[in-house]
Amino acid sequence: MSWQTYVDDHLMCEIEGNYLTSAAIIGQDGSIWAQSASFPQFKPEEITAIMNDFSEPGTLAPTGLYLGGTKYMVIQGEAGAVIRGKKGPGGVTVKKTNQALIIGIYDEP
């Protein structure tokens, strides 16, 4: 299975009436492994800031998490493993793996 198939079939699928609005798997170096058509174009420094927060949890809290130019307020996650951000009725969740970041963006139902 390709990473694109994983994004399309497993991240963008409906689960109990809920679904992500966009998703991606991005290498820790910022390279795109796979993404949904609606995933925002991000800046390399946005991924660098996310990686820095995984290394030093709390660094994004004062400035917010930016992805595709959109600012999310950082909310409680799991230090070194998951970062969560909130913007209005939606948000973003970033999960760090050994080699990549799995990112899901959602709107509240």
UniProtKB/Swiss-Prot annotation:
The keyword Disulfide bond applies. InterPro entries: PFN, PFN_euk, PFN_sf, Profilin_CS. It comes from the Eukaryota. SMART domains: PROF. Keywords: Actin-binding, Allergen, Cytoplasm, Cytoskeleton, Disulfide bond. One of its GO terms (molecular function) is actin monomer binding. GO terms for cellular component: cell cortex; cytoskeleton. Its main location: cytoplasm. Multimer. Occurs in many kinds of cells as a complex with monomeric actin in a 1:1 ratio. Belongs to the profilin family. Binds to actin and affects the structure of the cytoskeleton. At high concentrations, profilin prevents the polymerization of actin, whereas it enhances it at low concentrations. By binding to PIP2, it inhibits the formation of IP3 and DG. This is Profilin. The lineage of its organism: Eukaryota, Viridiplantae, Streptophyta, Embryophyta, Tracheophyta.
